[in-house]
Amino acid sequence: MSVNWLNLRPFNGSQHAAFEEICCQLAAAETPPPGSQFIRKGAPDAGVECYWTLPDESEWGWQAKFFLSPPNGNQWAQIDQSVKTTLEKHPRLSQYVVCLPIDRQDPRIDNQQWFMDKWNEHVQQWEGWASAKDMAVVFEYWGAHELFARLSREEHRGRY
């Protein structure tokens, strides 16, 4: 079984908004430490669609991009800009989840750059940006598998 993201029902007039909302609802259902507070943002969003503020005041943030194929140069630039903005506007960020409705290709073919290779390069760059601001941020990926695994849980029945 799988999710056909092309059939995602629009929310507030667009599939992109629907994808953001699904990602935020799944983020809201994560289990942070007791005493944490969940915040859903509207646009403009300072680089995150939603985030958790934990009792130690650190933050976990989520960014959703409704890209149905591996990101091209312009799309990577959009993700990079979101990361830069988040690092600037959320200085207590400790975890950042990028959500795309696709899994990362990883054929490991010499002299070729695939999605996983580019992801790893960008994470290394983002970690450098965070380090330059004296931040330690864990960058995570929620793709089709991670999203479907969460949507398949009984408590999320009917969200898609």
Walk through the language-model features, giving the residues of each.
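Mixed-charge (Asp/Glu-Lys/Arg
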Residues: 1-160
